[in-house]
UniProtKB/Swiss-Prot annotation:
Gene name tied to this protein: ZNF793
Function (record text): May be involved in transcriptional regulation.
Cross-referenced InterPro entries: KRAB (IPR001909), KRAB_dom_sf (IPR036051), Znf_C2H2_sf (IPR036236), Znf_C2H2_type (IPR013087)
Protein family: Belongs to the krueppel C2H2-type zinc-finger protein family.
Keywords: DNA-binding, Metal-binding, Nucleus, Repeat, Transcription, Transcription regulation, Zinc, Zinc-finger
Keyword Zinc-finger attached: yes
Molecular-function GO term, any one: zinc ion binding
Residue intervals of the KRAB domain: 8-79
Membrane-spanning residues: none
Full protein name: Zinc finger protein 793
Span of zinc fingers (C2H2-type): 227-249, 255-277, 283-305, 311-333, 339-361, 367-389
Length: 406
């Protein structure tokens, strides 16, 4: 088998700044440069680099200024080099992926690409950037998409004239690590709600374009609610929430259960309903192990173990473990009776009380005794009746014991 190995020296990947350039960098830019260079050298050592440790690395490890020469990027002078480096990289990848070719056990070093910084010089950057960029034609400081490489070569002259406009933020490119970092850290956070995202932007100076996930989170601050319901006047921050709310007025239920055909207005409600058919109970009680189909049911159940009563009546101070119990209790203070019988007009504070009352009109008796078959309107009446049978059975057993002893 043929093993393809690409020799790389530190000279091929070094990045340099003159003394004047270094002083013009901000502390954050210097720290970014230091991190990139130290990681680059670490990558070279991990793939077999055996040369002596360069002076620039020694300086950076001591947090000193790395003045290593006048040229900012030896061997790189124009945008055409970006195209050349990327072509070489793709050729190497194609060679390694060709059938019959064995890949060396040593990981190939990350290549470096070139980019103009705010001072008109060229600096090197880890090619994690190229994982999302197939050609430099689609990537340039001004954010303009170019269809052909010749357009890019001509465009870089105009770009050089607009350095201040292109780099209004005056920041270096950020080193990219797509997805989660090895320690599980979420790299970017929203300043409004502190929610973190796993996708990093490629360019720090184009936050609204390159960091799409973070931008979508920031584009509507939580204080703004531009989507207003014409039916009830309720306002929402995001259009998706507004659309879901409108279904409460229109009665639309686009999510149907494939097992029983029941439809729901929200997908999350359908998922909860489907657990009835599948028998899945993913939420277990931490104390007794009892499982529930919904997380809220587990939370309510666990309060029976902890004794927590978070819902307090503002009128009398009585507390409850569930919010529904508090809502029922409040109606005692307000005198509200929203449930009205359509037969006799009698009103009730709870729907369950109305259902019980409704059976007096319909004659329905759903609770039957297993001993004698007698039926009742309400379950408490059945419980009282069953105690009669229990006492009779106990008395009969006592008589049998007495007769047996004699």
């Amino acid at each position: 088998m043929i093993e393809y190995q690409i020799p790389v020296s530190f000279k091929d990947v070094v990045v340099g700044f003159t003394q004047e350039e270094w002083h013009r960098l901000s502390p954050a830019q210097r720290a970014l440069y230091r991190d990139v260079m130290l990681e680059t050298y670490s990558n070279l050592v991990s793939v077999g680099y055996e040369g002596t440790k360069p002076d620039v690395i020694l300086r950076l490890e001591q947090e000193e200024a790395p003045w290593i020469g006048e040229a900012a990027c030896p061997g790189c002078h124009c945008w055409e080099d970006i195209w050349r480096v990327n072509i070489q990289r793709k050729r190497r990848q194609d060679m390694l992926l060709r059938p019959g070719a064995a890949i060396s056990k040593k990981t190939l070093p990350k290549e470096k690409s070139c980019e103009y910084n705010k001072f008109g010089k060229i600096s090197l950057l880890s090619t994690d950037l190229f994982s999302s960029i197939q050609s430099p034609s689609n990537w340039n400081p001004c954010g303009k998409n170019l269809n052909h490489n010749l357009d890019l070569i001509g465009f870089k002259r105009n770009c050089a004239k607009k350095q201040d406009e292109c780099y209004a933020y005056g920041k270096l490119l950020q080193r990219i690590n797509h997805g989660r970092r090895p320690n599980g850290e979420k790299p970017r956070g929203c300043s409004h709600c502190e929610k973190a995202f796993t996708q990093n932007p490629a360019l720090m100076y184009k936050p609204a374009v390159s960091d799409s996930l973070l931008y979508k989170r920031k584009r509507v601050p939580p204080t703004e609610k531009p989507h207003v319901c014409s039916e009830c006047g309720k306002a929402f921050c995001y259009k998706s929430e507004f659309i879901r709310h409108q279904r409460s007025h229109t009665g639309e239920k686009p999510y149907g259960c494939t097992d029983c055909g029941k439809a729901f207005s929200h997908k999350s409600t359908l998922i909860k309903h489907q657990r009835i058919h599948t028998g899945v109970r993913p939420f277990e009680c931490f104390f007794c192990g009892k499982a529930f189909t919904q997380k809220s049911h587990r939370t309510e159940h666990q309060r029976t173990h902890t004794g927590e009563r978070p819902f307090v009546c503002s009128e009398c101070g009585k507390s409850f473990g569930e919010k529904s119990y508090l809502n029922v209790h409040r109606k005692m203070h307000t005198g509200e009776r929203p449930y009205r019988c359509r037969e006799c007009g009698k009103s009730f504070s709870q729907k369950s009380c109305l259902n019980k009352h409704w059976r007096t009109h319909t004659g329905e008796k759903p609770y039957g005794c297993n001993e004698c078959g007698k039926a009742f309107y309400q379950k408490p009446n059945l419980s009282r009746h069953q105690k009669i049978h229990a006492r009779k059975n106990a008395y009969r057993n006592e008589n049998l014991i007495i007769v047996g002893n004699t």
